[in-house]
């Protein structure tokens, strides 16, 4: 069974390595072109391209597969049996979807039909979902709308950030792809309809939940609004890790880890803090700096405790060290 693998980020690269290690024949990889990354804006290959080169697999890079007639023809000539797509970053046109005789299959990091689109892991955390997962689906022209042949779920822990959850889902995806390939190879000679029937594919209209859209994350999304409630801010910091940021004295500060302050219970003291915030405290205002605990500041409701952060031009550090680097004091306001 000859496979063409489509993917771009580290998440997908781990899937590629797993498939090759399992003994499957990956005859080519399609990925996004090299892009400028890091502080020096050095032109760098995608993690999938790096993995493919390590594995001596031919690589095709394309800005737009829909417009790239040359790559389309090269792929057609490969006569692959299966296309596997994992976080490729482009929508595949029908003429590509129709090429492999055993179909095009996508591993998507959500419990479909929830969070169709480019950033399902980010939005599941930002939205404070308690559960997410992996779906293996047959690809069609719609955005992540195809019938599902495999699904596995995982609990989103309170401590999960984007990196932690992405790594867990990548391992789940690798496992489900291997399970799916074992079944797909048994459908040789069947047309698409018969193949899906043999694989017990489930139409998404018969799955739990309502459709939702996980749009691409923008730079503007990463800016923290301290006027929001504490829980919403925490979930944004976790879901956009390590990119959620604020400003102080026109310098960018990335907030890497924060928690709702542990004294935010139903005690009279806690309620007094909340009540004071309505009258005396401004969202974003620092109300405590402590060497052991860090920086505590107000939100729209309860205070949060910043544990780790990164001032632009500096390395990531604990928030007390950040307060020294930034010359922060009690009553100063972040976001300005």
Curated annotation (Swiss-Prot):
It comes from the Bacteria. Its EC number is 2.1.2.9. GO terms for molecular function: methionyl-tRNA formyltransferase activity. Keywords: Protein biosynthesis, Transferase. Pfam families: Formyl_trans_C, Formyl_trans_N. It catalyses: L-methionyl-tRNA(fMet) + (6R)-10-formyltetrahydrofolate = N-formyl-L-methionyl-tRNA(fMet) + (6S)-5,6,7,8-tetrahydrofolate + H(+). The keyword Nucleotide-binding does not apply. One of its GO terms (cellular component) is cytosol. InterPro entries: Fmt, Formyl_trans_C, Formyl_transf_N, Formyl_transf_N_sf, Formyl_transferase-like_C_sf, Met-tRNA-FMT_C, Met-tRNA-FMT_N. (6S)-5,6,7,8-tetrahydrofolate binds at residues 110-113. The keyword Protein biosynthesis applies. PANTHER family: METHIONYL-TRNA FORMYLTRANSFERASE (PTHR11138), METHIONYL-TRNA FORMYLTRANSFERASE, MITOCHONDRIAL (PTHR11138:SF5). Attaches a formyl group to the free amino group of methionyl-tRNA(fMet). The formyl group appears to play a dual role in the initiator identity of N-formylmethionyl-tRNA by promoting its recognition by IF2 and preventing the misappropriation of this tRNA by the elongation apparatus. Belongs to the Fmt family. This is Methionyl-tRNA formyltransferase. It comes from Prochlorococcus marinus (strain NATL1A). The gene is fmt.
